From Swiss-Prot:
This is UDP-N-acetylmuramoyl-L-alanyl-D-glutamate--2,6-diaminopimelate ligase. A motif (Meso-diaminopimelate recognition motif) lies at residues 410-413. Coiled coil: none annotated. Carboxylation is probably crucial for Mg(2+) binding and, consequently, for the gamma-phosphate positioning of ATP. Its EC number is 6.3.2.13. It comes from Oceanobacillus iheyensis (strain DSM 14371 / CIP 107618 / JCM 11309 / KCTC 3954 / HTE831). One of its GO terms (cellular component) is cytoplasm. Catalyzes the addition of meso-diaminopimelic acid to the nucleotide precursor UDP-N-acetylmuramoyl-L-alanyl-D-glutamate (UMAG) in the biosynthesis of bacterial cell-wall peptidoglycan. The gene is murE1. Its cofactor is Mg(2+).
Length: 493
């Protein structure tokens, strides 16, 4: 694409150099990936500043450089200065890949907990509706039956638009994606033409990045504020909002589009009534403007009633018939790393779950306590280089519900694992409950499983689907499910 044409997507910028006859063959934010004809966009990250790598980019063949601050020397290629290269990158990527989300409807799901499950449920619903879906989520990118690994809940703007471009080429008819508060705040999803925005819930998380819970909510609300800012004003847009969450009033005010509410407690557009929670699943009646259906699901817990309501509301807004929604939801056996049972013939239960916030941990433990026959053990930690304020809260929740807690490492990253555990236990005393601290996660899981007797339940929380543990800057192979299976087998020997 000609640089001159690419620049049409930017409103304000300064150019130093000649843009005529400059052909751009790729967009890159990593100087190591630059080849002849690439445009290099300098992104200032948490630890690395792309402006420090302009020399390397030009040496590798960059044809143009996008910056957010003046450069100290000439490079012989056009230098385009913008106010914010993060937001500029998003718009450049959308333009370069020819506005891919114009070509299929897109659902964005945001909230502290439940995003992955809701996108999974929606994928299954559209599969039953015989509509090929592309999903971008915490676990993976899924296009039809193909899956690809993923690093962030929401990829950077460049990878995101590239993925949408691939979806378009593979004839995807419905896009579904998790949208993180980081991505919204950094402008990674600028230019994404959302048709439906879904809000699950809000509780404390990511306060290492956001100033406070209000700033976190503000970031989430951007998804709803951007509804209707797309390319086709004739298309109806919908905001799907959990009306039982205390933040719902602000999110309703954040959008000028149609609002669909869902609730388990009060009158709403979509409601769950006659809810039955058992050790084998969930049963409830879904009430909607299109009629009522009964859902019998193998998923567990009240939190999954909300997840199914959110997915159903988005599906109804997408014109999916109620009977298709019912069939799809009743077919689902579970979600990878979400309340996932580990069964090796043992006479006690082991469950792996991604719960890594105080609210999600409480939801899962409350569900377990509702059907537990004997003792409940929980293995849990907190991530390093992340919100320190939630650490004592995680320990408090664990001891409020479990008969015994094993506090252990999660992904310590660059922090001292023992220091993280000290933060978790700092406010505990002799009356707080039964717990032990085991720094090594493998040992912690093994200890809990060794302690379990007939009809006990062991919850291994925090990492869920993850197949790694981050220590320092290195990712090591580590899967809670595999570690649990091995511990169960060793106990039985």
């Amino acid at each position: 694409m000609e640089l001159k044409k690419l620049l049409e997507c930017l409103t304000f910028y300064n150019v130093n150099g000649e843009v005529e006859n400059c052909e751009i063959t790729s967009l890159e934010m990593d100087s190591r990936k630059i080849t002849s004809g690439s445009a290099f966009v300098c992104i200032t990250g948490f630890t690395v500043d792309g402006h420090d790598y302009v020399d390397q980019a030009v040496k590798n063949g960059a044809s143009a450089i996008f910056t957010s601050k003046p450069l100290m020397k000439e490079y012989g290629v056009p230098i385009i200065q913008v106010e914010d290269t993060n937001r500029a990158l998003a718009m450049l990527a959308v333009k370069y890949y020819d506005y891919p989300t114009k070509h299929f409807p897109l659902i964005g799901v945001t909230g502290t907990n439940g995003k992955t499950t809701v996108t999974y449920l929606l994928d299954k619903i559209f599969e039953y509706h015989q509509k090929k879906a592309g999903v971008i989520g915490t676990i993976q990118v899924k296009i039809g039956e193909e899956t690809f690994p993923i690093v962030n809940t929401t990829p950077n703007a460049l990878e995101l638009q590239k993925t949408f471009h691939v979806m378009r080429e593979k004839d995807v008819k419905q896009g579904i994606m998790e949208v993180s508060s980081h991505a919204l705040d950094m402008g990674r999803v600028y230019g994404c033409d959302y048709d439906i925005a879904v809000f699950t819930n809000l509780s404390q998380d990511h306060l290492d990045y956001h100033q406070d819970i209000q700033d976190y909510l503000r970031a989430k609300s951007l998804l709803f504020a951007q509804l209707g800012n797309g390319y086709d004003s004739e298309k109806e847009k919908y905001a799907i909002i959990n009306d039982d969450d205390s933040s719902s009033h602000l999110l309703k005010r954040s959008t000028a589009q149609h609002v669909i509410t869902y609730s388990c407690k009060k009158e709403a557009t979509i409601m769950a009534k006659d809810i039955e929670l058992t050790a084998s699943g969930i049963r409830f009646k879904l009430h909607s403007p299109l009629g009522n259906i009964t859902i019998q699901s193998r998923l567990m817990g009240m939190f999954n009633v909300y997840n199914m309501l959110a997915a159903s509301a988005a599906a109804i807004a997408s014109k999916v018939p109620l009977n298709v929604i019912q069939q799809a939801l009743e077919s689902i056996e579970g979600v990878n790393g979400r309340f996932e049972p580990i069964v090796e013939g043992q006479n006690y239960s082991v469950i792996v779950d991604f719960a890594h916030t105080p609210d999600s941990l409480e939801n899962v433990l409350q569900t377990i306590k509702d059907f537990a026959k004997r003792n409940v053990y929980v293995v849990v930690g907190c991530g390093g280089d992340r919100d320190r304020k939630k650490r004592p809260l995680m320990a408090e929740v664990a001891l409020n519900y479990a008969d015994h807690a094993v506090f252990t490492s999660d992904n310590p990253r660059t922090e001292d694992p023992q220091a993280i555990l000290d933060d978790m236990t700092a406010e505990l005393d002799a009356n707080s409950g039964s717990y032990e601290v085991v720094v090594d996660r493998k040992e912690g899981i093994a200890k809990a499983i060794q302690s379990a007797q007939k009809d006990d339940i062991v919850l291994i929380a925090g990492k869920g689907h993850e197949t790694y543990q981050i220590i320092g800057h290195t990712k090591y192979d580590f899967d809670d499910r595999d570690v649990a299976r091995n511990a169960i087998k060793q106990k039985g020997e």
